[in-house]
Amino acid sequence: MNGRKVDYLTLNGKDFFKGNNRIMLDNLSYYTVDKLQFFNQRSERSQLMGKDVERPDFIMNVKLKQEYSIGYLGNVEVGAGTHERWMGRGFALRFTDNSRISLFGNANNVNESRHPGGDGKWGQSDSPEGDTDTYSVGGELLVDDKRERYKEVFNASLLWNKSHDEQHTTSQQFIQQGDIFGYSSGVTAKQGFKFNIKNKFTLKRVGLISDTRLDYFDYDNDAVMRSVQFSEQPNEDWTQVLDSIFSTSQSNKMLDIMVNNVQDASYNSGRRWTAEQKFDYHKSLPWGDDLMLTARCLWNGAKNDGNSHYWLRYANGDMPDDVQERLSRSKSHSYDLHFGVEYAIHFLTGWHLIFDIAHNQQNADERNNLYRLDWDENFRQGEMLQSLTDYLHLRDANNSPDIDNTKHEEYVTASLHKHDSDSRRGRYFSFTTALNARYVSQDGIYTRGENTARPSDHRWLLRPSVDIEYQTRQWHETYKLHYDTEMRPLNLAQMVDLIDTSNPLAIQKGNPDLRPSIVHNLSFLFSSRFGTHGQFALLRSSATVMNSLVAVNSIYDKNTGVSTFMPVNVNGNWAYNSSIDLHRALTKDRNLNIESHTSYNYQHSADIKDNAKSTVKQHIVEQNLKLEYKRKQFALSLLSGISWNGMRLIGVDDINNVNFNYGANLQADLPFKLHLSTDIRMYSRRGYADRSLCTNNLLWNAQINSTFLNGRLLVAAKAFDLLHQISSTHTTFNSQARIETWRLSLPSYFMLSVQYKFNRNPKRK
């Protein structure tokens, strides 16, 4: 709203899918709305305490016409398209002034998993990577007592999905003896089921809040992978490289520079679950102070069964092939208990002094078993024994870790707050400074075969912070400043002085001499609305300095392609980010507008490679422009963007990747009550090491629709990727490697869909 971000929407003053603003706008019919209201509202915590102790929320309230304040509404849509694409979804809502019950369902094979209450709007192919079938159902129940005694919110969802994906990767590892070039290709097939329940119950007058959550997920995954490493970069692209290496007629030229190649076919199935219960109690004391009690219990469990056929071949003739038939079984359980007491002292001057004492206790145990079926000379591929007891003599004990971890944390926090809000003048000021001190006590038992390690860490960790926010001139200007220093606890798993050789090409070691990392964060934000042409400016800037950051030292054996990894501390890591967003109307009627986004990111990354420190300097510059014209039911946008990603590393040729795009969006009413929506954009990539990724892809999507029955019936024809040009490519840089990845994209299709919206409102007596 005029440059201010709406925190969430309400319907007739009540929550409506809080935090998911689009759902109301997408499902309410325009003729039911009386007016839109914008205002500041006390946060939920401030309402319970009866005073302003937090920044107020900025609310957009949709006020319905009197005759529509009670009733039903919903919509259903079905569609069928080319290339066997299909979709179906529905949404229904029953609401009154103080209650709401909603149901939704979604089924499609166009990579759409959103639902009302997700990020809002029912959308089309928002995730083009991979090929996924999705089936989901769910609902929400809300009851807000009109006498302000209690509030109940319950929601549940179930999701089934099945996906197919392909991925191709080219990489360049920066090695002192000479870079290593890798090529890999993988195909995965996944299917899974998710179940989620959330319940929030509030006794407003008592000040008690109960939050309950239950998550369950089970999965079945199949994967086939091929990879190869070279001591020199081949001239061919990845398809020619892999086809040559894994064919019967191999290229002698490629064999001369090959280090190793791997084929791996694997299957995994398992399940995970989480149960959480949390209680918050707020009590306003007679003398004006507040007491807050918190209790939380969290339980987690997981089980995974897997097997794989692994074949590693070395180019070095002195090294025999490593063929492994692996069977894995793992289980884990953990719990997390938290108890806290908070006491707030409120001064007449508007300052708040808060003391917080808390205890946190965690315990986790894992049981992992790896069986090497190839150790049995009588084993035949595809043959499985009936019981795990038949495999006990084949257990790879050194790669079957048993883990028991216990962590105790004692928190002491003191914070000083000042909140001052003046709605009449449109001003707001907030100052918060806090010092958090926690004593962390960690003990672990890690067992691999006959070897046992008992890592432990006991220390105080401090985190001071300062936050300042100031809004003025009828909310036209906003200033925000944040600083904190965080001492991060150690990960015991990285301190275990034992060796993991389950992956023959990636040997893992621990480091018992690790030190905690210390991270400094500083950020600043300024926004302003000014002038008579809807001018808006937003400036963001942040810097991060990391001391004793835990990095991974990798030592590469160029003869075999085996890497040995060990975590180490390294200094010299810092980052800076800055961006500016501008908006301005170019005409008095504000029909013609221009928007600009400019950003600069710098990463100074220090790492350890082959026991030597290496530093990468990475610059990312991005510029996006949008020119938009709107008049009545016509909207035309011209868009362009360019980004440069440059990396500098001593001993390595400079890397310069450039991505740029340009195109247009059009929405217009046509004769015969037709409406057209279309977008076309050219995406270009330059500077990639794999020349097959330097492409020009012209993407064109279009939709034409018409409404009938007073807007209740919508018939639409949709076309996704009309020119068959979509492509998905990602690049990753760090001080150890450059990785370029291509992923399968959803194929183009044409779809015809029909949507029907309905509402029913009882007559007022």
Task: Name each model feature, range by range.
Residues 15-42, 97:
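Short acidic/polar hinge/loop motifs at secondary-structure boundaries
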Residues 11, 21-22, 86-89:
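Conserved strand-to-helix beginnings and helix N-cap segments that scaffold or border functional pockets
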Residues 19-22, 42-84, 99-765:
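Primarily recognizes Gram-negative and organellar outer-membrane beta-barrels
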Residues 1-17, 45-53:
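Extracytoplasmic beta-strand/coil segments of soluble accessory domains associated
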Residues 4-6, 31-33, 55-59, 71, ...:
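Extracytoplasmic
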